[in-house]
Amino acid sequence: DELAFIATLNLLTWKPVIFAANVAEDDLSDDGASNEYVQAVRNFAAENGSEVFVICAQIEQEIAELDDDEKKMFLEDLGLTESGLDKLIAASYRLLGLISYLTAGETETRAWTIKVGTKAPQAAGKIHSDFERGFIKAEVVNYQDLLDCGTYTAAKEKGLVRMEGKEYVVKDGDVVLFRFNV
């Protein structure tokens, strides 16, 4: 009962925490495992239900000045799969229980952020309240499946586009076309 009451107070000390461990470039190769300070932060974070990710601010500064292709090559040369900024975003999403789904039209593709467990009508409501109110169904295809097929039409022809109803829980990386009538 006490914990439930405390949660309603929205105390800053009750909020989830992410620790960014800034290390030298040499400590990135093993994700800071050989760094005693990183291990101390990880132990503290584990005891307190927090997350830790390792970055090198110097490398992040260099990455920020590169275009996408150069950035990818630079990260590969360092043996990294993602930048510290990408790690921060992913950790934030996990800690806050968020996912993204996509909508795509002829002129615009957009990502929408929702809570994990959100059903299709409520996800549609993030775009416009009329979408939620008049929700009929959602045409859903996985992002990677759509990329592999090249076009929405090709994905549909291969049977990868599913019709989902009001109880469908939107998943991270879904590409959704909402059908509604108001």
Regions found by a protein language model. Give the residues of each.
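C-terminal-of-GTPase-core extension/linker across diverse P-loop GTPases
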Residues: 1-171, 176, 181-182
